[in-house]
Design a protein with these regions (language model features):
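C-terminal motif of bacterial Sec signal peptides marking the signal peptidase cleavage site
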Residues: 18-21
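Structural signature of alpha-solenoid helical repeat junctions
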Residues: 33, 70-71, 108-118
Length: 130
């Protein structure tokens, strides 16, 4: 086998996975999916390392269910967690601060407390990095 042919084959093996991973990003997210289905798909994509697709599903929740605070907070927290995993700390900080602001401006007991506490923990991690 000639060197140039071997080189072409090796390059193909290197870039082929990247090509297929890009094809998993949803172009259109079905409108009939519930918030829980969207979150589940986002988590599945995250676990498989497909962060762009994961973000698309979580963003769909924040856009479609913005009037449902518990769903909005859950998806927002997942977005912040995703940014932390990618080491996009500036973006994560914005998301977690928004979550904390929502809690600060709401009546106590009206929202699930878990995302407030989780966001506080993540913000502390961000401060420790500085």
């Amino acid at each position: 086998m000639k060197f140039s042919t071997l080189k072409t084959v090796l390059i193909g093996f290197i870039f082929l996975p990247a090509l297929f991973s890009c094809s998993t990003v949803p172009k259109d997210i079905p409108e009939e999916l519930t918030a829980q289905e969207l979150i589940q798909k986002g988590q599945s994509e995250f676990e498989n390392g497909r962060y762009v697709a994961s973000l698309a599903y979580y963003n769909a929740v924040t856009e479609r269910y913005a009037e449902y605070p518990a769903l909005y907070l859950e998806a927002s927290y997942e977005i912040g967690h995703l940014y932390m995993k990618q080491k996009k700390y500036d973006k994560a900080k914005v998301v977690f601060q928004e979550i904390l602001d929502i809690y600060a401006n709401s009546q106590p007991g009206t929202l699930p407390g878990s995302y407030n506490k989780l966001s506080q923990v993540e913000m502390q991690k961000l401060q420790d990095k500085n």
